[in-house]
Amino acid sequence: MRGIKTLRRTFVKSALVLAAGMATMSAPLVSAEEWAEKEELKFGFIKLTDMAPLAVAYEKGYFEEEGLYVTLEAQANWKVLLDRVIDGQLDGAHMLAGQPLGATIGFGTQAHIITAFSMDLNGNGITVSNDIWSQMKEHIPHEDGKPVHPIKADALKPVVEKYKADGKPFNMGMVFPVSTHNYELRYWLAAGGIHPGYYAPHKGDTSGQIDADALLSVTPPPQMPATMEAGTIYGYCVGEPWNQQAVFKGIGVPVITDYEIWKNNPEKVFGVSKQWADKYPITHKKVVKAMIRAAAWLDADNNANRPEAVKILSKSQYVGADYDVIANSMTGTFEYEKGDKREVPDFNVFFRYNATYPYYSDAIWYLTQMRRWGQISEEKSDDWFMETAKKVYRPDIYASAAKELIKEGKLDAKDFPDFATETGFKPAQKGFIDNIVYDGSKPNEYLKKFEIGLKGAEKI
Amino acid sequence: MTTALSNIAWISPFVSIAKGEDVSGNIQTIIKTIGLPLAGLLVFLMIWQAAASNINTSLGQFPGPGDVVTQTKGLLTEHFTEREKADAFYERQEKRNAARVKQDPTYVPKIRDYTGKPTYIDQIGTSLVTVLSGFILASLIAIPFGIVIGLSANLYSAFNPVIQIFKPVSPLAWLPIVTMVVSALYVSDDPMVPKSFVTSMITVMLCCLWPTVINTAVGVASIPKDLVNVSQVLRLSYMEHVRKIVLPSSIPMVFTGLRLSLGIAWMVLIAAEMLAQNPGLGKFVWDEFQNGSSDSLGRIMVAVITIGLIGFLLDRVMLMIQRKVSWDKSAATR
């Protein structure tokens, strides 16, 4: 024991000398360096592959290089995670894009949460049980013996109608009322003419099952496969690796990825409370810097680092699923039916296409879906959508972090949007499964394009 | 040395053989004390292996004894790599602190604890500390309380219903209440011990209080009349009566209670850790279940066996202490 201690001491001593040398050499360069106000931080996450930027920033030492000592802690479910960010037990967390928005407008728990970093694009899938799949399959066009993708919910409609006629509820799982998954599953179902149900918070109804053909309910992501195996739900929408897990376990078949529902849709964000961000602005900026570097690493050289990232994620303290299960989607492929593995190179996007930049138009899309399904029970003006997005999404903090990285030579200016001219609105987006075009600057007009869903002054 | 060795049941026959005493008789004793348990264990392992290869779950085959050995090794390796990472972490931190002091002389360097994950061994440590804290806290309350109500039949009748009602309450029922109360009352910016630790400890305490209370009370109430008379003749004060007469004569019963309590404490702790996501073996089991990797079941099995072994060891330790302090050696053999 003493041997180890002396060894450690000599090591530290030589390290000190070394460090002193380095410090004098680089002193003029970093003389104006700021220090984080809070150095010991605890961030929460849910066991999903898109928590990767956090794990990578930790394992690759990006947090430490910013002088931050971060502990990452898996959380039981999205509600617990949000509550712990609100009451300060967590400094920040991997959040569903809808969570900061929902919390800020007061759907569910009311609290002002902001985000300056978008964690990834795409990454979800919809899976149905083997039994439902065999019933759906006869309604899906085939080519060369394989089903033609993307599969629309039209193929599921006859199945749901049969259940309805038999008086049996058709239950499906999603991960949280304001989750991307809820909106994507609803979008897909509604595009195929299946009504996913309305919310009516002003009447105290937050089950989201009013007028529903398919009844959606909440299940935490890691428990999805087990819940479907138990027969409680017939299908679910969730992030990876829980769709691929169903294939590996042979209990279900993923029918569509969210990339096919909406090409390059924003998925998770890194959320902190407004209060925390105001109290520790430098810390917040440094956190964003470390995470931008992690995201860039994840997408560098055409996903060359992904296998290493998968190795990190498969550790039990992060996602903990088997390497092969995580690798399937993280390395750009997706397995639908067992053996039917297809290339989806953009299934998980962490950095390219400016994936990390918090676009106002992304925020507004989520707000439009909250309005569409009644979570926002009254008509809101286009200005309201704009103001709310600005309250929650903070590209200004992102820009200051990115500019520092460019100055330090860690990343290139061409990796980022042009901050001088960027408005925060993506040009009108196509690429939705129902071919409806989304323009973030006209939310009310967008809502009018949907056949199923609340619009204008409609109220439940 | 030999006398100390010969006190341990399964070693004494070897010692006797070495001394050349009653060889055939001692061999029989050896077969009984070592051979039979070993045979039982072997049969169990065989049944386990056979059953395991016939159970297929969606996470792969049910782990047999071989998988458990592999996983145990894996967990140990993980522990040592994590320790190396921790050392590297402290080194980097020293460097960074030194560099910072260079630039900003007013900065007082601070060494922060390792931020990596707790290893399996760490989890065992956390669980043991938690269970012992809860158990000691419970004993500190239960023994005095048991003595007081044991000494007075009236007090006993008064408190008995309360005890009987709370005794069968499961930890899972207490947990939400304890969690909320601890969150409300235990507020500090830089807490000495984490909230989760306090929650687990109090839950354990509430559940393992009762066997000690009841056994102590019964032990105290059943002191031989003669001893009580002696105490009265000598006109011992209340405290002296407790110290000289009550405690010594009720110790076997108190320890029976304590042993039961510790057993319950250990079981409650694992459940509390699982449900409340408090660090420890219970959380380890839950996390592995959530991970759903092909190693998960094997790792959970390792935890199951560890929990059993530790529970067994805790019981043996209590038994040893009981033998040491008890005058009635025959009361504590099993």
PLM-predicted stretches and their roles:
Chain A
Residues R2-L18:
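N-terminal secretory signal peptides and thylakoid transit peptides that target proteins
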Residues M22-S31:
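C-terminal segment of classical bacterial N-terminal signal peptides
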Residues E33-D211, L215-S217, T227-N264, D418, ...:
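Short, glycine-/small- and polar/acidic-enriched structural segments
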Residues I126-T127, V269-V272, W276-A277:
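Short glycine- and hydrophobic/aromatic-rich loop-to-beta-strand nucleating segment
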Residues H181-E184, P220, M224, W242, ...:
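Internal, well-ordered alpha-helical segments in soluble enzyme and binding-protein domains
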Residues K279-D396:
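Secondary-structure end/capping motifs
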Residues I364-I460:
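Conserved C-terminal helix/tail region of periplasmic/extracytoplasmic solute-binding proteins
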